[in-house]
Amino acid sequence: MKNPFAHLAEPLDPAQPGKKFFNLNKLEDSRYGRLPFSIRVLLEAAVRNCDEFLVKKNDIENILNWSIMQHKSIEVPFKPARVILQDFTGVPAVVDFAAMRDAVKKLGGNPEKINPVCPADLVIDHSIQVHFNRRADSLQKNQDLEFERNRERFEFLKWGSQAFCNMRIIPPGSGIIHQVNLEYLARVVFDQDGCYYPDSLVGTDSHTTMIDGLGVLGWGVGGIEAEAVMLGQPISMVLPQVIGYKLMGKPHPLVTSTDIVLTITKHLRQVGVVGKFVEFFGPGVAQLSIADRATIANMCPEYGATAAFFPVDDVSIAYLVQTGREEDKVKHIKRYLQAVGMFRDFSDSSQDPDFTQVVELDLKTVVPCCSGPKRPQDKVAVSEIEKDFESCLGAKQGFKGFQVAPDHHNDHKTFIYNDSEFTLAHGSVVIAAITSCTNTSNPSVMLGAGLLAKKAVEAGLNVKPYVKTSLSPGSGVVTYYLRESGVMPYLSQLGFDVVGYGCMTCIGNSGPLPEPVVEAITQGDLVAVGVLSGNRNFEGRVHPNTRANYLASPPLVIAYAIAGTVRIDFEKEPLGVNAQGQQVFLKDIWPTRDEIQEVERKYVIPGMFKEVYQKIETVNKSWNALAAPSEKLYAWNPKSTYIKSPPFFESLTLDLQPPKSIVDAYVLLNLGDSVTTDHISPAGNIARNSPAARYLTNRGLTPRDFNSYGSRRGNDAIMARGTFANIRLLNKFLNKQAPQTVHLPSGETLDVFDAAERYQQAGLPLIVLAGKEYGSGSSRDWAAKGPFLLGIKAVLAESYERTHCSNLVGMGVIPLEYLPGETADSLGLTGRERYTIHIPEHLKPRMKVQIKLDTGKTFQAVMRFDTDVELTYFHNGGILNYMIRKMAQ
């Protein structure tokens, strides 16, 4: 069908009549000029892709009518311009694509129809671990080990880049996906097939929102949704409310962008922005560099919004020039955005659009801070950290509590390391990592850390040798400017050598701690601390032996590493005493904003971006040497423990089955609030006594070769065994943290997988009970695929994180939500009942269903199928089944 809005297309430049754009001003609709800039991007995509099938004229009217429709939970389609993936989520996506080709062939279709129809960039950044640190060859040794362990996965990805059109792989060692996206992949405006249109994307990583800082609308989705977008399906989303976040004033000279983002995170958590867009405006925005904006946008999942948008302005255009983008392209970007009403001047309040609600922050009120000890939204001023940690020590087990008895608060343990004696206590820092795209993309905080290191070394300070220090930049550009500016040797002297280019400590790839340190922590039952410049510090994520983890700016990471403890008041106590007996305070070595900016102006230059990125796809010799098969259908190796054909499509036929009620289901797990996708499907180490470890041992592997759960996401047998295998999982059936549950028919306590297997062998369906914010954290598709493989038919929770809810639907698992004001406690549910959930044949979005217990009690819950499209996926047994049936016909 012809696009009903084709008449809006006109040339941007009369000298190039073949290159057109959809001029939304020709809609001659006064509502357009009042729309938030982020909603204008949704509108343009709908107008350009309107076909009266996937995108209808009524959708465009609904978006234009945003001021009214934002309150009505109206569903709109969005076709992003591209998709980005990292390797932990990218491997299972390519596995699914390979299995879908097999399934289409089996159903009599053409397997080569399964191909990305939009650009898909996969950046390998999640596999490298900090095994070696504090040595000049750390980088090479970690990269060699990464290749040795992941060769099979990398060969598979290389096969994928050759077998599928439109798929580009950025090799390992290049950097972190979101930083590479910001510095290199982002187009800001596409110039393709004779048409200009805004760059937009979804990514299989929740911190995809970082690109919103450059004015490119994007957010994280589950791997399952991303696969559908790659196959040409729009994302079906509820038209979001947009919170206007007004920034005013100027930050204090000692405040970093990290302090600003941690302040905003806490503030927006309190406002409540889940499922909404946040759009930044006000004169304060012009004070922020693109790196600062990207840092704020990066932590969007931590404050719970879907996107955190900074419209494009002159600062964005200057950044494109600074990062070596072609000047001619940059001119067209500005010209297009001005023509279509998407270019912003933050000092001109007449451009301010309508918002659902406006909240404000005066940047001069921001103080240096950290977040912790267990959640990114728990901001604590640096001046309060010592007091806060001590109150957490004694407080009841929880987000702000470790429940250490008062007479044990001063416990300590001595140990020998490298022939010297050291002492650890509660609050001792054992990991200090400058890591994560959140901060390493920001030259001001990275150079701030470098200058602080220089002053610390010159003042005679050092870091104790047992502290696991590391520096893992998000791109080669960082190393380039740290080296050129002369601060690199000082960072190395304090133990912050470059250990790899990847996510590393931020995602739990922190590697092992020295054995004597682990023994001291476990024997002393100590609350040891990790300090990192990352974006998440959920319990059990950073390292199993650091029960407290604080997010901090890179300079503060170094400061706490030198202090060796978080139980310090930097105002009153020195960081350390040098060889001359002089006390050195933090204020003596903290660099000012002016000092940092002077170095940044001199050393962060376009030439360095061009030099690093023009060879990014060819510079890794190990990658270039990999052999990969050339067939279009993948030849599965039955002996592989990394890549396995998944069972999702084995019994798939072309015919649809009517939905079935869930009868007499047992509760596999009875969980509380804030169960993260890390709890459901951990990404870190595979514990030696776990079901996944037994599976690998039975196949002849030793613990050294187990690798991490994240690296094994191409193997469903391991991932099913890793589901709910987080050691910090708190199950009400047990009243303790353990990856275990009670098998209700026998009363035995078993590993979660073993219990689920018993239920499945007996043909018994399962459900999970949970509290608020179920599935918060990473957009991890295995947190939905894993429960599906365990035989879980539904989850009953008080509320869900948006991405996880869609992922459950995408796998055919029913997300049920208690009615407002009701909870498991208010209904008197113990989880030991059996549940029958009546599923009617004709379903509607957000329909109420009847739940009956074997005790005779009945109550209602809402089925969280929010859109008609989600219902279609459910009827098909999931989104991928729907796509296969479509491609096979």
From Swiss-Prot:
<feature type="binding site">
    <location>
        <position position="86"/>
    </location>
    <ligand>
        <name>substrate</name>
    </ligand>
</feature>
<feature type="binding site">
    <location>
        <position position="437"/>
    </location>
    <ligand>
        <name>[4Fe-4S] cluster</name>
    </ligand>
</feature>
<dbReference type="InterPro" id="IPR018136">
    <property type="entry name" value="Aconitase_4Fe-4S_BS"/>
</dbReference>
<protein>
    <recommendedName>
        <fullName>Cytoplasmic aconitate hydratase</fullName>
        <ecNumber>4.2.1.3</ecNumber>
    </recommendedName>
</protein>
<keyword id="KW-0963">Cytoplasm</keyword>
<dbReference type="GO" id="GO:0006417">
    <property type="term" value="P:regulation of translation"/>
</dbReference>
<dbReference type="InterPro" id="IPR001030">
    <property type="entry name" value="Acoase/IPM_deHydtase_lsu_aba"/>
</dbReference>
<dbReference type="GO" id="GO:0006879">
    <property type="term" value="P:intracellular iron ion homeostasis"/>
</dbReference>
<feature type="binding site">
    <location>
        <begin position="779"/>
        <end position="780"/>
    </location>
    <ligand>
        <name>substrate</name>
    </ligand>
</feature>
<feature type="binding site">
    <location>
        <position position="506"/>
    </location>
    <ligand>
        <name>[4Fe-4S] cluster</name>
    </ligand>
</feature>
<dbReference type="InterPro" id="IPR015928">
    <property type="entry name" value="Aconitase/3IPM_dehydase_swvl"/>
</dbReference>
<keyword id="KW-0408">Iron</keyword>
<dbReference type="GO" id="GO:0051538">
    <property type="term" value="F:3 iron, 4 sulfur cluster binding"/>
</dbReference>
<keyword id="KW-0816">Tricarboxylic acid cycle</keyword>
<comment type="function">
    <text>Conversely, when cellular iron levels are high, binds a 4Fe-4S cluster which precludes RNA binding activity and promotes the aconitase activity, the isomerization of citrate to isocitrate via cis-aconitate.</text>
</comment>
<dbReference type="GO" id="GO:0005829">
    <property type="term" value="C:cytosol"/>
</dbReference>
<dbReference type="GO" id="GO:0051539">
    <property type="term" value="F:4 iron, 4 sulfur cluster binding"/>
</dbReference>
<keyword id="KW-0479">Metal-binding</keyword>
<keyword id="KW-0694">RNA-binding</keyword>
<feature type="binding site">
    <location>
        <position position="536"/>
    </location>
    <ligand>
        <name>substrate</name>
    </ligand>
</feature>
<feature type="binding site">
    <location>
        <position position="541"/>
    </location>
    <ligand>
        <name>substrate</name>
    </ligand>
</feature>
<dbReference type="GO" id="GO:0000900">
    <property type="term" value="F:mRNA regulatory element binding translation repressor activity"/>
</dbReference>
<keyword id="KW-0411">Iron-sulfur</keyword>
<dbReference type="InterPro" id="IPR000573">
    <property type="entry name" value="AconitaseA/IPMdHydase_ssu_swvl"/>
</dbReference>
<dbReference type="GO" id="GO:0005783">
    <property type="term" value="C:endoplasmic reticulum"/>
</dbReference>
<dbReference type="GO" id="GO:0030350">
    <property type="term" value="F:iron-responsive element binding"/>
</dbReference>
<dbReference type="GO" id="GO:0006101">
    <property type="term" value="P:citrate metabolic process"/>
</dbReference>
<dbReference type="GO" id="GO:0050892">
    <property type="term" value="P:intestinal absorption"/>
</dbReference>
<dbReference type="Pfam" id="PF00330">
    <property type="entry name" value="Aconitase"/>
</dbReference>
<dbReference type="GO" id="GO:0005737">
    <property type="term" value="C:cytoplasm"/>
</dbReference>
<dbReference type="GO" id="GO:0051536">
    <property type="term" value="F:iron-sulfur cluster binding"/>
</dbReference>
<dbReference type="GO" id="GO:0003994">
    <property type="term" value="F:aconitate hydratase activity"/>
</dbReference>
<dbReference type="GO" id="GO:0010040">
    <property type="term" value="P:response to iron(II) ion"/>
</dbReference>
<keyword id="KW-0456">Lyase</keyword>
<dbReference type="InterPro" id="IPR036008">
    <property type="entry name" value="Aconitase_4Fe-4S_dom"/>
</dbReference>
<feature type="binding site">
    <location>
        <position position="503"/>
    </location>
    <ligand>
        <name>[4Fe-4S] cluster</name>
    </ligand>
</feature>
<dbReference type="GO" id="GO:0010468">
    <property type="term" value="P:regulation of gene expression"/>
</dbReference>
<feature type="binding site">
    <location>
        <position position="699"/>
    </location>
    <ligand>
        <name>substrate</name>
    </ligand>
</feature>
<comment type="similarity">
    <text>Belongs to the aconitase/IPM isomerase family.</text>
</comment>
<dbReference type="GO" id="GO:0009791">
    <property type="term" value="P:post-embryonic development"/>
</dbReference>
<dbReference type="InterPro" id="IPR006249">
    <property type="entry name" value="Aconitase/IRP2"/>
</dbReference>
<dbReference type="InterPro" id="IPR044137">
    <property type="entry name" value="AcnA_IRP_Swivel"/>
</dbReference>
